[in-house]
Amino acid sequence: MAGSTLRFSLLLAAAFAGRATALWPWPQYIQTSELRYTIFPQSFQFQYHLSSAAQVGCSVLDEAFQRYRDLLFGSVAFRFPHPIEKRHTSEKNSLVVLVVTPGCDQFPSLGSVENYTLTINDEQSLLLSETVWGALRGLETFSQLIWRSPEGTFYVNKTDIEDFPRFPHRGLLLDTSRHYLPLASILDTLDVMAYNKFNVFHWHLVDDSSFPYESFTFPELTKKGSYNPATHIYTAQDVKEVIEYARLRGIRVLAEFDTPGHTLSWGPGVPGLLTPCYSGSHPSGTFGPVNPALNNTYEFMSTFFLEISTVFPDFYLHLGGDEVDFTCWKSNPDIQAFMKKKGFGDDFKKLESFYIQTLLDIVSAYGKGYVVWQEVFDNKVKVRPDTIIQVWREEIPVKYVKELALVTRAGFRALLSAPWYLNHITYGPDWKEIYLVEPLAFEGSPEQKALVIGGEACMWGEYVDSTNLVPRLWPRAGAVAERLWSNKMVSNLDFAFKRLAHFRCELLRRGVQAQPLSVGYCDMEFEQT
């Protein structure tokens, strides 16, 4: 979108204060006016255009229509059978949705088109999109345009919007290993992700602390690796529910099973998988990363990731590869002998690379792509050209802007997470620092910058569980959402604060216990139900 068009849209926003300019994230182009139309909840409908490729029976939109009707009006239509203000001709009793391309039963993907246009004027109320995924984004925007007068009447202003995401991958990571998050917490998070136009749920399922994923191929992993196999696990049905719940909101589920490090919870369920650590010439009784010297290790990984590849439908799996501590490998005589046999000398990065390359070959054979943490790139592991590198370190070994330059110069696609670790909290409006991050602020060619496909906000679970997850996430994660959706030029903090504060109040109205941005109040304060 041209800079002049964007400036025009911002000038309009300043000229017409009100609900129509309180959108989050901000669209690529918006033109609005003070002309408003009345909406009567008891008669309002979402309708399919006669020419739409999606019609009644489209699960994604049928459910979205009901969901947004409930969000907008709840039981208002039944409590107020007649509006307080007098009925007149300037009313809107429907939003007509026209989807160009069929695809109601598919899963969203990295290449999904999310563009939409929204036109509300005297002649029509029309949401036009190429796909159902774009229609979902447009429905969220429409829901934020509707406002209610003090007398109780609903309105929507005359508006034209053309919108599309700046980046195709806009993710949120949840860590369900260090603290187990109940299924309801995950589903609630997916709801709020959709309100913010996030489209990737990065599910960091397992880690050193616990293994809550219920494996049907290796049930002992869960029985012996979870905090409590009766209560603190995600069953096969739970996982299916998360995947489908996310799909209906246009959200991909990117499952992460991090190896060879971060795997202590795997050990009890798979004897021999982890490396025995030594103290001198004797085992110390402790264990380190996955043992890369045994054929049994790769036989296990082959079978396990065959299961994972069938359970999770997304093309990509996240294979981790970060923070591998070599201390245990160095102490183990069998590992030392294997290194000598392979000609690795004392370079344990070569051993790590051997393991990861073998694992990547296994996963590739199942027709999957993969995302890895930046250490895989830093340690010069040979990976496929279509590998996605997730940059998470802020300053070590280099600052993240330099890392992005290095990754893209090598021709790899990149995701940025380094400045967006939301589990790191400070007193005051830390959302501003989050908001002002510019993902492409590194030295590189246009071709390099095109390889940055987006980023993720991360909520690691050392000090986060279901008691504090929601207020720690929201509305702070929204700052990341807008940075990944909106035009680069949308960066004014005053403009952002007014809209984000309004959006936070809207989240409260929707039942989300989002924390305040500063001093102030909302017309509808949060009430625990």
From Swiss-Prot:
The signal peptide here is: 1-22
Superkingdom in the source lineage? Eukaryota
What positions belong to the pro-peptide in this record?
A: 23-88
| MF GO annotations | acetylglucosaminyltransferase activity; beta-N-acetylhexosaminidase activity; protein heterodimerization activity
Summarizing activity control, the record says: Addition of GM2A stimulates the hydrolysis of sulfated glycosphingolipid SM2 and the ganglioside GM2.
Please provide one cellular component term from the Gene Ontology annotations of this protein. Answer: membrane
Enzyme Commission designation: 3.2.1.52
Disulfides per UniProt: C58-C104, C277-C328, C505-C522
Any idea where this protein resides? Answer: Lysosome
| Residue span of region Critical for hydrolysis GM2 gangliosides | 423-424
Major localisation: other
- Among its keywords, does the record have Disulfide bond? yes
Q: Does Glycoprotein appear among the keywords?
A: yes
Under InterPro entries, the record lists: Beta_hexosaminidase_sua/sub (IPR025705), Glyco_hydro_20_cat (IPR015883), Glycoside_hydrolase_SF (IPR017853), Hex-like_dom2 (IPR029018), HEX_eukaryotic_N (IPR029019)
Q: Which residues are glycosylated?
A: N115, N157, N295
Give me the reactions it catalyses. Hydrolysis of terminal non-reducing N-acetyl-D-hexosamine residues in N-acetyl-beta-D-hexosaminides; N-acetyl-beta-D-galactosaminyl-(1->4)-beta-D-3-sulfogalactosyl-(1->4)-beta-D-glucosyl-(1<->1')-ceramide + H2O = a beta-D-3-sulfogalactosyl-(1->4)-beta-D-glucosyl-(1<->1')-ceramide + N-acetyl-beta-D-galactosamine; a ganglioside GM2 (d18:1(4E)) + H2O = a ganglioside GM3 (d18:1(4E)) + N-acetyl-beta-D-galactosamine; a ganglioside GM2 + H2O = a ganglioside GM3 + N-acetyl-beta-D-galactosamine
Q: Which keywords fit this entry according to its UniProt record?
A: Disulfide bond, Glycoprotein, Glycosidase, Hydrolase, Lipid metabolism, Lysosome, Signal, Zymogen
What's the short name of a Pfam family annotated to this entry?
Glyco_hydro_20
UniProt-annotated catalytic positions = E323 (proton donor)
| BP GO terms, sorted | adult walking behavior; carbohydrate metabolic process; cell morphogenesis involved in neuron differentiation; dermatan sulfate proteoglycan catabolic process; ganglioside catabolic process; glycosaminoglycan biosynthetic process; glycosaminoglycan metabolic process; hyaluronan catabolic process
Q: Fill in the subunit field for this protein.
A: There are 3 beta-hexosaminidase isozymes: isozyme A (hexosaminidase A) is a heterodimer composed of one subunit alpha and one subunit beta (chain A and B); isozyme B (hexosaminidase B) is a homodimer of two beta subunits (two chains A and B); isozyme S (hexosaminidase S) is a homodimer of two alpha subunits. The composition of the dimer (isozyme A versus isozyme S) has a significant effect on the substrate specificity of the alpha subunit active site.
Q: Which family does it belong to?
A: Belongs to the glycosyl hydrolase 20 family.
Q: Briefly, what is this protein's role?
A: Hydrolyzes the non-reducing end N-acetyl-D-hexosamine and/or sulfated N-acetyl-D-hexosamine of glycoconjugates, such as the oligosaccharide moieties from proteins and neutral glycolipids, or from certain mucopolysaccharides. The isozyme S is as active as the isozyme A on the anionic bis-sulfated glycans, the chondroitin-6-sulfate trisaccharide (C6S-3), and the dermatan sulfate pentasaccharide, and the sulfated glycosphingolipid SM2. The isozyme B does not hydrolyze each of these substrates, however hydrolyzes efficiently neutral oligosaccharide.
- Entry protein name: Beta-hexosaminidase subunit alpha
Species of origin reads Bos taurus (Bovine)
- The gene designation is HEXA
